[in-house]
């Protein structure tokens, strides 16, 4: 578990491609302090600011942000998946959205967190006959991290939705990490909605 790796009372996080803050909310619930969220979409930014007015949200193109000098224990982000998904024609790095992976990588290189977490669609593993995943691993490992990935399904972790995602974890060399174990019982949609008034 990540919490066991970080020896800080309240580990700090910088989240890239934050969307409406799903990952940040989960980390906040786990005791992490969000230092910065970067998001380009104005509607997502408005949602973030409405739901968490105290969060530091940067409404900017990630290309414009200089991460040098920034500090955080963890960097997270779901770099845009459309370039790797079935719906997005699977063009990979040939699609400009696919090249945003390199901006995630640049942030990791400049911030030098103890850990980074990235997520993407399962199809990224097969994109361009496996060349895409090799590039991703080579780039991230070149910064001195042990990098691993695993396909996790949200339904196995207390979410009432079957949603498979590749979760990349990078840790400083020598740090042990273990993915969380599956929960024994899945939550159904009716379980999730049981307290919602009619």
Task: Give a label for each model feature.
Residues 17-18:
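Class I SAM-dependent methyltransferase "Motif I" SAM/SAH-binding loop
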Residues 38-41, 119-120:
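Conserved acidic E/D residue at the C-terminus of a beta-strand in Rossmann-like folds
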Residues 5, 64-74, 82-198:
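Class I S-adenosyl-L-methionine
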Residues 54-61:
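Conserved SAM-binding strand-loop segment of SAM-dependent methyltransferases
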Residues 26-33, 51:
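A short, Lys/Arg-enriched amphipathic alpha-helix followed by its capping loop at the start of a domain
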Residues 42-46:
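Short alpha-helix immediately C-terminal to the canonical SAM-binding loop
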Residues 12-14:
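Conserved beta-strand elements of the Class I
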Residues 21, 25:
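Glycine-rich SAM-binding Motif I of class I
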């Amino acid at each position: 578990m990540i919490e066991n790796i970080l020896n800080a009372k309240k580990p700090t996080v910088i989240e890239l491609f934050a969307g409406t803050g799903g990952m940040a909310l989960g980390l906040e619930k786990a005791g992490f302090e969000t230092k910065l969220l970067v998001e380009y979409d104005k509607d997502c930014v408005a949602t973030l600011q409405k739901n968490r007015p105290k969060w530091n949200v940067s409404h900017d193109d990630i290309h414009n942000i200089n991460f040098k000098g920034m500090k955080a224990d963890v960097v997270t982000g779901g770099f845009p998946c459309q370039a790797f998904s079935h719906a997005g024609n699977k063009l990979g790095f040939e699609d400009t959205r696919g090249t945003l992976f390199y901006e995630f990588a640049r942030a990791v290189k400049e911030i030098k967190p103890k850990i980074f977490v990235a997520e993407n669609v399962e199809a990224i593993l097969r994109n361009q006959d496996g060349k895409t995943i090799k590039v991703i691993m080579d780039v991230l490992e070149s910064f001195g991290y042990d990098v691993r990935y695993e396909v996790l399904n949200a339904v196995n972790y207390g979410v009432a939705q079957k949603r498979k995602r590749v979760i990349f974890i990078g840790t400083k060399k020598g740090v042990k990490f273990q993915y969380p174990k599956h929960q024994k019982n899945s939550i159904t949609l009716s379980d999730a909605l049981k307290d919602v008034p009619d």
